[in-house]
Regions:
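Sec-dependent signal peptide recognition
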Residues: 3-11
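N-terminal signal peptide c-region/cleavage motif recognized by signal peptidases
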Residues: 16-19
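Boundary/entry segment of secreted carbohydrate-active catalytic domains
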Residues: 21-58
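Substrate-binding cleft and catalytic face of glycoside hydrolase catalytic domains
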Residues: 45-69, 74-196, 202, 206-208, ...
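Conserved, mostly hydrophobic/aromatic
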Residues: 53, 126, 137, 169, ...
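Extracellular serine-dependent O-acyl
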Residues: 135-140, 182, 252-257, 288-306
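Noncatalytic carbohydrate-binding groove/subsite architecture in carbohydrate-active enzymes
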Residues: 159-282
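Aromatic- and carboxylate-lined catalytic core of secreted/periplasmic carbohydrate-active enzymes
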Residues: 283-370, 374-377, 384-393
Length: 394
């Protein structure tokens, strides 16, 4: 019996160690929204080249009685996803610890010590349940903008509250699983208000209680228009990384835990071709930054079939599960993005963005270029992706 236990522990350790290396090319999922089984989510993610999934672990849905996780279809679905992500996709899922629970947090978020303690207990029980299965945790989601909370009870912008929540939750998870990689913030580098808030969090010492910063790089209402472009968005990520290094005196890993483009009929700038080139550019530029350890795109499948509803149309697959051009693109390039033997870099030379993929051993390289903020065609992308096979030929 002991030998079997040790074997399980060794296998779990090896899987987690393997899962923690290499670039994450992940995708967000919404179990329960699309009529899919847990197996289907992992199947579609695998089919289209993703090596991780990101999903909420809603506190309100897993604990209806104090201290007891519900025996429910929701929890069984999550159990399957978190238990099988590494074996199915190659890397651990990212588990988002969110949001409030009416038993403990009447306003939908923790605002005092007793409510923070209840959230910490939920996080600790979650870490115990998935130790050896889940490596990545995100503490809350988009606190500053109040996602998941009613508009009348938007969480306070007081940095002390979120910092204290992070501090206590970080310590509790690490006590259970020292190997866990814990992300915080959901910071939008394009948003001046988010950067201001992050600086206030840093003043409170929050960087001592995280392993990485999670970032969401959507276009923000208070951002300049250039940040709508991949070039502009990644430039803002560069500025964020520089600021973090200056404030902390050390390197801090960044994980893009949400990024996406909604393909709606009423927006002439969100055609399938436009989104394809934006996804491709963003992928190339993000992979060229060594401090960006991964990206979870938002999201796997459209959340509805109303082509005029922005929130329905972020999927890489349509609501009927047929693939968009972006899904086919990820499918074609994912193996190169995840290959540790291939290094991507980018630079601007003679008013052109030049991305270089290079085999670290053979030094064989392939370049792709475009005019900053200019268009690239599907055929140009296909040609470049096809050329990358020469980097892995032996």
């Amino acid at each position: 019996m002991l030998n079997n236990y040790l074997k399980v522990m060794v296998v779990s350790c090896l899987l987690i160690c393997k899962s923690s290396s290499a670039f994450i090319l992940g995708i967000g999922i919404h179990p329960g929204n699309n009529g899919l089984s847990a197996q289907d989510y992992l199947k579609y993610a695998q089919e289209y080249g993703f090596n991780s999934v990101r999903t909420d672990f809603f506190w309100s849905r897993i604990e209806n009685r104090q201290g007891i996780f519900n025996d429910s279809d929701y929890l069984r679905t999550q159990d399957y996803i978190f238990s099988n992500s590494i074996s199915s996709l190659g890397k651990s899922a990212l588990l988002v610890l969110d949001y409030g629970n009416r038993i403990y947090t009447p306003k939908g978020y923790p605002e005092n010590q007793s409510e923070i303690s209840a959230y910490v207990n939920y996080a600790s029980r979650t870490a115990k349940r998935y130790k050896g299965k889940v490596l990545y945790y995100e503490i809350w989601n988009e606190w500053l903008q109040g996602t998941g909370v009613s508009k009348k009870n938007k969480p306070t912008a007081d940095p002390k509250i979120y910092t204290e929540l992070v501090k206590q939750t970080y310590k509790a998870i690490k006590a259970v699983d020292p190997n866990a990689i814990i992300m915080i913030g959901s910071i939008n580098p394009n948003s001046p208000s988010y950067i201001k808030w992050l600086n206030r969090l840093i003043n409170e010492g929050i960087l001592d209680y995280c392993d990485a910063i999670s970032i969401h790089t959507y276009f923000a209402h208070d951002a300049p228009l250039v940040s709508k472009t991949p070039e502009g968005a990644v430039s803002n990520i560069d500025k964020l990384e520089k600021m973090l290094k200056e404030r902390s005196g050390r390197d801090i890993d960044l994980y893009i835990t949400e990024m996406g483009y909604s393909q709606t009929e009423k927006d002439v700038y969100s055609t399938s071709d436009m989104i394809l080139q934006n996804v491709a550019k963003f992928m190339f530029l993000a992979k060229s930054r060594p401090f960006i350890k991964g990206i979870w795109w938002y999201d796997l499948i459209n959340d509805g079939d109303d082509r005029t509803n922005k929130e329905h149309n972020f999927g890489f697959l349509y609501y009927d599960k047929t693939p968009k051009k972006t899904a086919r693109y990820i499918q074609s390039i994912s193996s190169y993005m995840m290959d540790d033997s291939i290094m991507f870099s980018s630079q601007i030379i003679d008013d052109k963005v030049i991305v270089t993929a290079r085999n670290k051993t053979t030094q064989v390289s392939k370049k792709f270029e475009w005019v900053p903020y200019g268009s690239i065609t599907e055929s140009e992308l296909d040609s470049y992706v096809n050329s990358l096979s020469s980097l892995t030929d032996h």
